[in-house]
Structures are given as structure tokens and as C-alpha cells.
Swiss-Prot record:
Heme b binds at residues 46, 65, 93, 96. O2 binds at residue 62. Monomer. Root nodules. Nitrated in effective nodules and particularly in hypoxic conditions; this mechanism may play a protective role in the symbiosis by buffering toxic peroxynitrite NO(2)(-). Nitration level decrease during nodule senescence. Belongs to the plant globin family. This is Leghemoglobin-2. It comes from Vigna unguiculata. Signal peptide: none annotated. Keywords: Cytoplasm, Heme, Iron, Metal-binding, Nitration, Nitrogen fixation, Nodulation, Nucleus, Oxygen transport, Phosphoprotein, Transport. The modification Nitrated tyrosine is found at residues 26, 31, 134. The keyword Iron applies.
Length: 145
């Protein structure tokens, strides 16, 4: 069980709303960061076959889904102290053989993207809340393998 406060959930929700304010822009930041850190990750995402394209609805849709899952993770943590991931989500990550290092790259890209999205509203407290929500989501996905 993880203690996650209403305030932490609110911080994560606010960051998600900032991301949603310009999904195409922040999707590009997110996937560009992933590919800078781990170029081979391109092979994990079929929609990156032609590069990072903000007009690609699969790219923006996947980013929105991931960021939404982190927001949902925060809500689950506040409500119950744990996160449960859908078995299908675990299966996809298992099938693609996503490893711990790749989860870390995604977390770093998520944090960088949200930091840019919220601008001067970024704080250590927000960063901690986002990282905790993501880490618990990642653990739940791995558990669902």
C-alpha cells in the first residue's frame, strides 16, 4: 500500500490537464525524448515507423492514453493505495518484451514532457507525485504480464 494524498492526485491531474492543452506538441516532446534516449524503442511503436509526426493520430492517441493511465494511477493510489493494470496492457508489454530500462526511459520522457507542459508550476512535489504514480503503474503492468 502506498500513501498518496489528495494534493498529490491534484498535482498529477493538473499536469495531465496541462499536457492535454496541446496534445500534439507534447506528444512530440514525449516520443522525441524516448527516441533520443533509446533509439531502438522506435521498433516498439508501430506508429513511429515514419518518425515522430504530431499529425499522426496513433502517436497522439497513444501518448494521451499513457498520460491518462498515469493520471488514473494517481486516482487509484489515493483511493486504495495500489494500482491495478488491465491484463491486456500487461500482455502487450510482455509480448513486446518491454524491460525495466525501457520503463525508466518512458518515465524520464514523461517527466520531461510534463515539466515542459506545466512550465513554472513544476515543483519537486509535483515531480515526486508523477514519478510515484508512474512507478506504481509500471509495477502493475509488469505484474499483469
Amino acid at each position: 500500500m502506498v500513501a498518496f494524498s489528495d494534493k498529490q492526485e491534484g498535482l498529477v491531474n493538473g499536469a495531465y490537464e496541462a499536457f492535454k492543452a496541446d496534445i500534439p506538441k507534447y506528444s512530440v516532446v514525449f516520443y522525441t525524448t524516448i527516441l533520443e534516449k533509446a533509439p531502438a524503442a522506435k521498433n516498439l511503436f508501430s506508429f513511429l515507423a515514419n518518425g515522430v509526426d504530431a499529425t499522426n493520430p496513433k502517436l497522439t492517441g497513444h501518448a494521451e492514453k499513457l498520460f491518462g493511465l498515469v493520471r488514473d494511477s494517481a486516482a487509484q493510489l489515493r483511493a486504495s493505495g495500489g494500482v491495478v493494470a488491465d491484463a491486456a496492457l500487461g500482455a502487450v508489454h510482455s509480448q513486446k518484451a518491454v524491460n525495466d530500462a525501457q520503463f525508466v526511459v518512458v518515465k524520464e520522457a514523461l517527466v520531461k514532457t510534463l515539466k515542459e507542459a506545466v512550465g513554472d508550476k513544476w515543483s519537486d512535489e509535483l515531480g515526486t507525485a508523477v514519478e510515484l504514480a508512474y512507478d506504481e503503474l509500471a509495477a502493475a503492468i509488469k505484474k499483469a504480464y
